[in-house]
Amino acid sequence: MDLTFSEEQDELRKVVRSFLAKHSDEAEVRRLAADERGHDPVVWRRMAGQLGLQGLAVPEEYGGSGFGYVDLGIVFEEAGRALLCGPYFATVALAAEALLRCDDEAARTDLLPGITSGETVATLALTEESGRWDEQGIRLTARETADGWQLTGAKTYVPDGHLADLLLVAARTPSGISLFAVAAADAPGLTRTPLPTLDQTRKQTRLEFAGTPARLLGAEGTAWPGLARTLATASVLLAAEQVGGASAALDAAVEYAKLREQYGRPIGSFQGIKHKCADMLMEIESARSAAYGGLWALDAGDEREIAVAAALAQTFCSEAFTRVAGDNIQVHGGIGFTWEHPAHLYLKRAKSCEVLLGTPSYHRELLATRLGI
Amino acid sequence: MELDFGPAVRDFRDELRDWLAAHLVGEFAEHRGVGGPTDGAAWEVRLAWDCELSAGRWLGVGWPQEYGGRGLGLLEEIVFEYEYARANAPYRATVNALDLLGPMLLQMGSEAQKKRFLPPILAVGELWGQGFSEPGAGSDLASVRTRAEREGEEWVVSGQKVWTSFGVHADWLYVLTRTDPQSVRHKGLTLLLLPTDQPGVEIRPIRNLAGQDEFAEVFLSDARTGADMVVGEVGQGWRTAMATLGIERGTTLLPQQLTFEREAESLIDLARERGALDDPMLRRRIVDAWISVRIMRTTNLRTLAELTTGRTPGAQATTAKLYASTRHQQLGYLAMELAGPAGQIVGENYGLDTRQRSFLLSLAETIYGGSSEIQRNIIGEQFLGLPKEPRP
Ligand SMILES: Cc1cc2nc3c(=O)[nH]c(=O)nc-3n(C[C@H](O)[C@H](O)[C@H](O)COP(=O)(O)OP(=O)(O)OC[C@H]3O[C@@H](n4cnc5c(N)ncnc54)[C@H](O)[C@@H]3O)c2cc1C
């Protein structure tokens, strides 16, 4: 039974938290939110160089540190707490995972070291107009020509697609779903259109491909199982991020409830507020169990358990973060409704997380199916 | 759910599994899963089962050997509770003494009290009831009014206690009394051990909403007990009582949650039979019920892992009861809805099936052991550090 954190893991949390306190404070989050690119390359390189965060759970043979998902989950939780802006989720939770899960050793050897060293920003381009995260949602087609494979069609809602050096694109080929790699810089026929987002801390892009040359990863038509597994892993890591965001929102609510006075006493002494905060904590601790359960499952490696735990974590943590972020605004009253106050940043992040990998209803249905309900 | 607690306890686990396989048979096996912390069903069978456990030396696994226990560690206690719940053995009738009074005596009792009271608990020779609540002292336990006065070598106790679980079966009570008549609230309280077999003690059953005479009211009129029956110090009863309530070693939640898991599984079966899974609204609530029990499991495992590695349990330990009790109630409401009109029909003499009983009894889970409102106060004030409400 090892469902607790080691001292090394506590230390990792501390180090990441203090790094992010310096490099992703509110001023920095607001600066990047207002910026169209939303990314600080200097911090990105430090994350890789000083802390090795991009390659934390990548095996050493590809330039990573070979830690587990519990360790990586700690980083995502802290990233969520600090509302970290930039392509960390896209690169690490989606792209690096997709490479690890595809059946192409050469691609891993070629592409992962760039990610772990902090040189490459990468993302996974899967969703299209339908916004669906399942196999049927993938319509974009790839065609084999004399010069190799070419992609034609559009991907949208792609996280950090505007910045990514490396695009991993899920496409339909005659024999099924296949995964392709596109080096975005100067890729012929690629148009990238940044989409203005409700949550300005996480950027999205529309990608149009017109006969864009691409490298097939693994055997043609066999990519879906690896992608499904990637989405399961990413669901758990996103859940950890959601727990972190919710914790920060609760901290803010509690701090304010101790300070703000009405009727001659702190509002936190009123049960209406106190009990709301207690319920927020209960929600968060339950979400933590959901997310950590997923992380432990990932490290244990039982595929059925991973599929179940991932769907559970996304269903529960999405709803929990949104509720807690909304309650935080309620505890703050009018000030919480302003652009000046950070409360809305958490609410908006909560809403974008909620749909990032499919809505809670979608994940609830996945869970039901996986449980045979 | 299969959990492996590691090689160190494997022999212990195997011994227990073998013993359960050999002894949980016949009438005992027929009463699998029967009973609960406030469920008096099949009392005689459960008592006999406790005697069987006692003969096998399975009561007090973690208690010192000198008092009849096995002297094993927390991990073995956890394994015991887990395997016990896994086998779905009847709920122990003696659980109050095993989980609350015993640990309290081990922590705060005198040597003489431990020698006198612990062995009979493990031998199922004496049953105990908790006399804390009073008609005027519920959530606000510090307002107890039952008086105890010293007369020579005895304490003389008068007052009224209420909601004493399994009170009609109790040979002894541990009661919170006011020994300093001038005192208010937490000060001047004393915890006393009091025999029930005497003229000054009258115990009347109270019928609960499930139709069971489970808890009781206790009338004390010049009831007597020895001067040596004080646990902790005179005037320090609040501390002693709080120590009892603080005895939450994470071992009790595990069996409860396995029961909830069984209920969730049976709920899914029922829903399938009724075709309810095709109804999107019901389907959603069913999946959410399953999610709740799974989250309870992970929450408990987090706490157990912290306890067994010597860490201080995290915030989840303070919110676990609130979550489990409220979610279990929701599960009950849903099960009753799925059961439909057939779930509305009871047996003779208000005989309830498992589902009906579990649903009705779940309504107590948000009241006893600190109501949900009190839990939220505790979480808010003691964990989150929010200011207390000013006292009028
Ligand atoms: C099945 C069962 C078994 C029990 N077994 C035992 C036993 O063996 N021994 C024993 O001593 N006691 C026992 N109890 C008693 C139990 O501890 C009390 O019922 C409990 O403490 C609540 O007290 P009360 O019933 O007086 O309700 P009250 O305290 O009067 O509460 C009534 C309502 O008011 C709310 N409330 C009270 N104070 C506050 C506040 N400050 N803020 C917000 N809301 C508040 C409560 O949450 C509740 O909703 C048992 C109870 C039950 C239901």
Could you say what each language-model-derived stretch is?
Chain A
Residues 1-83, 102-106, 114, 118, ...:
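Alpha-helical interface subdomain recognition
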Residues 100-103, 169-172, 181-184, 208-210, ...:
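Short beta-strand-to-turn element immediately C-terminal to the catalytic PLP-Schiff-base lysine
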Residues 125, 152-191:
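A short core secondary-structure module
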Residues 67-68, 134-136, 160-164:
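Short glycine/proline-enriched turns and hinge-like loops at secondary-structure junctions
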